[in-house]
Amino acid sequence: MATQTNESFPLEKTRNIGIMAHIDAGKTTLTERILFYTGRLHRMGEVHEGAATMDFMEQEKERGITITSAATTCYWDDHRVNIIDTPGHVDFTVEVERSLRVLDGAIALFCAVGGVEPQSETVWRQAEKYDVPRIGFVNKMDRTGADFENVLEMMEDRLSANPVPVQYPIGAGDMFRGVIDLIEGKAIIYDDESQGMQWDVREIPDDLESKAEHWRINLLESVAEYDDELLMKYLDEDQEVEPEELHTVIRKATLNRDMTPMFCGSALKNTGVQRVLDGVTNYLPSPNDVPAITGHHPQDKEEDITRHPREDEPFSAVAFKITTDPYVGKLTFVRVYSGTLESGSRVYSPTRDEDERIGRMMFMHADSREDVDVIRAGDIAAVVGPKNLKTGDTICDPDHPVVLESMDFPEPVIRIAVEPRTKADRDKLTNGLTKLAEEDPTFNVRTDEETGQTIIAGMGELHLEIIIDRLKQEFKVEANVGQPQVAYREALTDMIDEHYVLKKQSGGRGQFAEVYMDVGPIPEEEEEESGLVFENEIKGGVIPKEFIPSVERGIESAMEDGPLAGYPIEGVWVRLYDGDHHEVDSDQNAFEIAGRLGFREAARHANPVLMEPVMEVEVVTPDDYMGDIIGDLNGRRGQIGQMGQRNDAQVINAEVPLSEMFGYSTDLRSLSQGRAIYTMQFGSYEPVPEEVASEIMDEQTMSATA
């Protein structure tokens, strides 16, 4: 394919969005429909083409269009829309997290029957963390039990959201026929035969006039809070509030995250999708509408550097996804925050402290790639060339280095041993695991030094099942898989003042390093940190500054092997406050050893405890089985939390150690005759009770000596 010149597309007409949803809310169907409608509009310039459209839909049903790339570019109403894929399953919340990090706005998708489900809450919290403005779409209005108003109430109760309908459904379930546009004051009835390409605009049906009036007043009152002029018009009965005025103020309130405009429809039945696209262009932000991104200088974390979404600023971008493409090899998806980048350029990776060369650059469409020669501020593109970039890394202009805010990924909580079935599979297994680990920052691979086994770790059983499946499908590797094991951690609970001297003299040059340090758990005010918080308070050069990083490196290596059972130590605070060195016998190696051995000594005396991953579990069950299920969760060391009702079912929330949840799917099926369902996601690491901890440590000792 010939390389296209990427003409500068107006930033104010660019939208970088994601679709956030629970696993069965209909995200794939909505995405397919968006790609279908925007694809026809972009290529043909005309949407209303009955026969061609229906042919395309037939193929679509056969092929099942899905977004396999991390980002897809499409066009709607003179706007360019980049859709960043966000998965729905809880084991993949990290995928959602990294998507939200680089998008500007989102469509929050809800099932009209299920409403706000556990994953909806998780994704909503992540969107709040990254200040992402949202519009909402209540999907599946054609399903039995669909209830638009119930979804709004659940959003208020469970998400503390402010949903403001700009539409109201005409009917529900089998009777769903269209929507009332509360801004225009008209009914929109969709034509089933035209695959949603044609609709009639009518007067509001008599039986819905009072409902429409109620929700229009709700819309006007909600919006009037954000604009004095509009408020005066609303209060003055002689003045009509124009649709354009409403759009302007709704946009302002949405960008400030004060409200979530709500749409409704059925993606499967092709109703309401174009209106959601209008909502994307009308209400969601362009790159110009979001604050400039702030990073820091690679050599000085205290020096803030700001990058605005302008082409005349130095180039900066974040790599948010790495994939392997069968045709072009390693693809790195980047979000450009400032400046421009031409193919063939060299960029600097401050996190790796090395240069990378950019080869090809391309925009990904639903079913094709578009090679371009330049990418600009606001663009989302895939690049070929970088060898060592990882997810979350910054790339920038070598003459203007900056580290943009990096992504924090949770540590894996479950691990299994894998081994190739044949010698021929060994290299393929190593190669496959390396590539998969490059793509997914929550998937770890390591070799157990004592047993020689390859250990893979991830966020849940499903996560690792999919990894094993991908090894088979993509890399043609057959692997034997061990039993899942919990990824325990260790933590320090007491503060220790450690003085350690390394002094070795064995003829010729010796080794000398002396350190004084406080070692203990991270203080409460810094609890968001999870690894090592290292504070350097050395004064007067008693330890030369070039040796300080060596002490930190030594501590980090010692943290990988805890004093209780050899599990990694989490949440450590160290203050290096004094020490000494020798002009000849001190070097970086000596201080690294002193840091490692000094920390190891301190950790033994800091009252270490074993920590286990505790999962947030939600079970939805008919009344009849509630007692048995609660009893079973208690038997798994579960702490029962909030209980309530959702539609006709009971909802039980509990916190349960991961070690007690293996095989729960089968047990729950037996307890409830297959009628209860559950979801589970990582909550936090908590201390293991003493009697359980001693069993785990005994097992670990036995396996180490076996």
Curated annotation (Swiss-Prot):
Residues that hold GTP according to the record: 21-28, 85-89, 139-142
Keyword GTP-binding: yes
GO MF annotation list: GTP binding; GTPase activity; translation elongation factor activity
InterPro entries assigned to the protein according to its UniProt record, in alphabetical order: EF-G-like_DII (IPR053905), EFG_II (IPR041095), EFG_III (IPR009022), EFG_III/V (IPR035647), EFG_IV (IPR047872), EFG_V (IPR035649), EFG_V-like (IPR000640), G_TR_CS (IPR031157)
Top-level taxon of origin: Bacteria
GO BP terms, alphabetized: ribosome disassembly
Xref: CDD domains: EF-G, EFG_III, EFG_mtEFG1_IV, EFG_mtEFG_C, EFG_mtEFG_II
Domain named tr-type G: residues: 12-288
SMART domains tied to this protein: EFG_C, EFG_IV
Keywords on record: Cytoplasm, Elongation factor, GTP-binding, Nucleotide-binding, Protein biosynthesis
Keyword RNA-binding set for record: no
Subcellular location(s) per record: Cytoplasm
A single cellular component GO annotation: cytoplasm
NCBIfam families: EF-G (TIGR00484), PRK12740.1-5 (NF009381), small_GTP (TIGR00231)
Family: Belongs to the TRAFAC class translation factor GTPase superfamily. Classic translation factor GTPase family. EF-G/EF-2 subfamily.
Role noted for this protein: Catalyzes the GTP-dependent ribosomal translocation step during translation elongation. During this step, the ribosome changes from the pre-translocational (PRE) to the post-translocational (POST) state as the newly formed A-site-bound peptidyl-tRNA and P-site-bound deacylated tRNA move to the P and E sites, respectively. Catalyzes the coordinated movement of the two tRNA molecules, the mRNA and conformational changes in the ribosome.
Protein name as catalogued: Elongation factor G
Species of the source: Salinibacter ruber (strain DSM 13855 / M31)
